[in-house]
């Protein structure tokens, strides 16, 4: 992260402004950089990002892209612990704990990626997750694409397949960061929708809750007909999200390697320039969750190279296999190849791995 210091001002008498004033301005600027909530998606990815992966039916993991670390960390926690919690995205968490979480995810150099969830509930995580999405100054689907994403739901007599094809083209047109975040969110929301018999979060409910942060227009917020069209569009995207995942038919994720990264690494794919070196096996801690009160009780350890499965992890609509993920707060770093993506293979849920910075301020 680059901090612009600027030039000391010279007054009419040729004297330098006080060092105290200059230092105060510098500290304010660095403090502003730490306010992750309310940043644009592009800026949030520059501050702290996590790599996301897809898993094919044969178990092969493939690199897909990046999402903000706060989304990955909360999303991972929620998918592992909250898919059967009633009203998970409607029930409020503790305002005090939410403030602590928001500060943790907004403070460098770690930005919450190694945050310990013990003592926090899934409702705290769900509130922080929603807050980050809703506070982005530009929605997940940018305003310039707003009408195009509503259009397929306003044309009469279209079949679902025709609408799917229209949305595929529109999703492909999105900027890469927005497309990757949108597909991750749709995947996550579909997981909760598939468990609606227990969590009461139907796809309709989820579309109503997340539509303001994903697909909305400031001029349409007070007109029920307009925002209902947006909710219907998001509902369709959730219900058909498996049709929008771009998959990799031939190439696979390269072996995990210890790769130095720059704080200014962009959100685009990184080209591998050196032969990968396998890293040593490490272990991660997975939370044991009490669904009655939404709290964490104990820890379990798994080998990083083992396939950890979870009894409450739902199967996605890509396959009937259980999901296994690596906590986005866990090492190692990776190098990834640039891939040309296609839709020829079926994929499971998104997976996340942390991409930590080598150089920290």
UniProtKB/Swiss-Prot annotation:
Gene Ontology terms describing biological process: negative regulation of Rho protein signal transduction; regulation of cell wall (1->3)-beta-D-glucan biosynthetic process; regulation of fungal-type cell wall organization; signal transduction
Main location: membrane
Keyword Metal-binding attached: no
InterPro entries for this protein: Rho_GTPase_activation_prot, RhoGAP, RhoGAP_dom
A Pfam family annotated for this UniProt entry: RhoGAP
Record-marked site positions (Arginine finger): 90
GO function terms (MF aspect): GTPase activator activity
Assigned GO CC terms: cell cortex; cell tip; medial cortex; membrane
Top-level taxon in the UniProt lineage: Eukaryota
Keywords: GTPase activation, Membrane
Domain Rho-GAP intervals: 52-245
Protein's cellular compartments: Membrane
Function according to Swiss-Prot or TrEMBL: GTPase-activating protein for Rho1. Has a role in the negative regulation of (1-3)beta-D-glucan synthase activity and cell integrity.
The name this protein goes by in its record: Rho-GTPase-activating protein 5
The species this protein was found in: Schizosaccharomyces pombe (strain 972 / ATCC 24843)
Lineage: Eukaryota, Fungi, Dikarya, Ascomycota, Taphrinomycotina
Gene that encodes it: rga5
